[in-house]
Amino acid sequence: MDFSKGHGTENDFVVLPDPDVRIDLSAPRVAALCDRRRGLGADGILRVAKAGALAGAGVLAELPDGTSEDDWFMDYRNADGSIAEMCGNGVRVFAHYLRAAGLESRDEFVVGSRAGGKPVIVHSADGAFGEVTVDMGVVRDLGTSAATIDGKVFNGIGIDVGNPHLACVDAHLTAASLSALDLTAAPGFDPGFFPHGVNVEILTRIDSGAVDMRVHERGVGETRSCGTGTVAAATAALRFDGADSGEVNVRIPGGQVTVAVSGGRATLRGPSVLVASGTLDDGWWNGLA
C-alpha cells in the first residue's frame, strides 16, 4: 500500500492514495498508523479518492455541499481513528499532493471535505514544497464560552469553521507565557456547549498584525499547528479588537500562516511540505484488522 508523508506548518499527515476505495480505514488501523512508535506517526490520515467513489463505497452517505462526484475528496481521520469534518492544514497538503502526484494540473480547483467543497489556489508546488490558499468558507460565531487549564479560566468564543473551536484571547499573555502553558492534558470545556468535543486555541491579542497561538485538538492532543484553529484564532483576535474583518499572521509552534477574514468568510494561506513516500508492508497492515 503506497503512502506519502507531508506536513503543513508541522501538522503532519500520512497521505493514502485510494482511488478505488479499497483501504479499510478502521479506527484501530488509523490509530496504529498514526502512532509515532508503532507506525509511521502522524496527526492524521488523508485518504485520496474521488467524492463519487467514496459515496459509491458507502464512506459518504451523500455528497457534501459544494462537492461534485468528480472532485477529489479529502477523507480525513484523526490520529485516534475518529472521522473529522475538516482540516485546513490537511487541505493544503492534500492539494499539494494532488499536483505533485500528477493527479491535478490546475492551479485552482475544489477539494471536497465533510465540511463542504473547499476552493484552493496552488501558488507553487514541486515534489517537496508548496504554497496553497484555501477558501475556508463561512466562519460562524457560536457564542461565548471558556476553557480551563491548570485551574485557570480562559474566556473565549465558540467558532465553527466546519468543525468546532473555542478560541481564547488573553490580553495578558505574551509569547513566553503562552509557551509555558501545560497543554499535555485536554483543557476543560463545557460539554453542554460543545457536545461533540472541541478544539481549543489559546492566543495572544493582535500585535503588529500578528498573534501567537497554541492548540489542543480533539482526538489528537496538542499539535504544532491547526489550520482551522488558526482561522478561529484570527477571527477571535479581530473581534477582541472590535473588528469584523482584517488580515492576521498567526504564529504557531510549527511556523506561520496568514488568515484573511471578510464578510463572515475566511481564507487561509500557508506552506506545505511533502517529505517522503513509500510502501506499507501488507502483512503489517493486514495484521491490524
Curated annotation (Swiss-Prot):
Pfam families linked: DAP_epimerase
Keyword GTP-binding annotated: no
Keywords: Amino-acid biosynthesis, Cytoplasm, Isomerase, Lysine biosynthesis
Subcellular location: Cytoplasm
Entry's Gene Ontology molecular function annotations: diaminopimelate epimerase activity
Highest rank taxon of the organism: Bacteria
Gene3D superfamilies: Diaminopimelate Epimerase, Chain A, domain 1
Keyword Manganese: no
The protein's Enzyme Commission number: 5.1.1.7
Catalytic activity: (2S,6S)-2,6-diaminopimelate = meso-2,6-diaminopimelate
Catalytic-site annotation from UniProt: C87, C226
Residues at the site labelled Could be important to modulate the pK values of the two catalytic cysteine residues: H165, E217
InterPro entries the UniProt entry points to: DAP_epimerase_AS, DAP_epimerase_DapF
Annotated positions binding substrate: N11, N78, G88, N89, N163, N199, E217, R218, G227, T228
GO cellular component, one term: cytosol
Gene Ontology biological process: lysine biosynthetic process via diaminopimelate
Subcellular location, principal: cytoplasm
Pathway where it operates: Amino-acid biosynthesis; L-lysine biosynthesis via DAP pathway; DL-2,6-diaminopimelate from LL-2,6-diaminopimelate: step 1/1
Known function: Catalyzes the stereoinversion of LL-2,6-diaminopimelate (L,L-DAP) to meso-diaminopimelate (meso-DAP), a precursor of L-lysine and an essential component of the bacterial peptidoglycan.
NCBIfam families to which the protein is assigned, alphabetical: DapF
Family indicated by similarity: Belongs to the diaminopimelate epimerase family.
Assembly mode: Homodimer.
Protein name from the UniProt record: Diaminopimelate epimerase
Organism of origin: Rhodococcus jostii (strain RHA1)
